[in-house]
């Protein structure tokens, strides 16, 4: 089960993730968070941003969903040198030219840049660039989430779940209970696929 693997991976890194975010929060009065992705990966940020804007004080943590194509087209509009920024890159392969270019531009343009790289491919360029960078938190997704097909069902849902786990304010035990319930619900739905197919036919 991809979601269980994603949660287990998060749980193993939970202390490091919390320390990473706390260090940023303690150092800066205002932090801009950019959820960035190319293609379907961009929709992860689009989906999550309204929720995080609701639960965070935007005077401290300001969440934004910006497609990498938009950042590359107008970098100076989205990346400000004097604004502490957490660039959260969502990427299935981690090799999209605009995703790689977004990271390069952010490094050039933002003085206080932090990164969280959420990707499904350990061998991708984004994952490789994150290695050894203390200001870049690499969160690799389960190998099974690296969809080979056109539809990015596993990668999309896995990356979205990980981002929720990273930024949600709930305690670990609450998160674990919610993920368990989510997995059970999904299994119930999948268990009814045959019944639905019979009705359709």
Spans of model-derived segments:
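An N-terminal, well-structured beta->alpha segment
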Residues: 1-31
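Short, flexible loop segments at the rims of nucleotide/cofactor-binding pockets, characterized by
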Residues: 8-12, 64-67, 93, 184-191
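Generic macromolecular interface patches on structured domains
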Residues: 9, 13, 169-172, 196
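Cofactor-pocket helix-loop regions in the catalytic cores of large enzyme subunits
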Residues: 15-21, 176-201
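Glycine-rich helix-loop-beta junction characteristic of Rossmann-like nucleotide cofactor-binding loops
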Residues: 20-27, 78-81, 200-201
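Short, charged low-complexity intrinsically disordered segments located at boundaries
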Residues: 26-35, 83, 187-198
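Glycine-rich phosphate-binding loops that contact phosphosugars or nucleotide phosphates
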Residues: 28-182
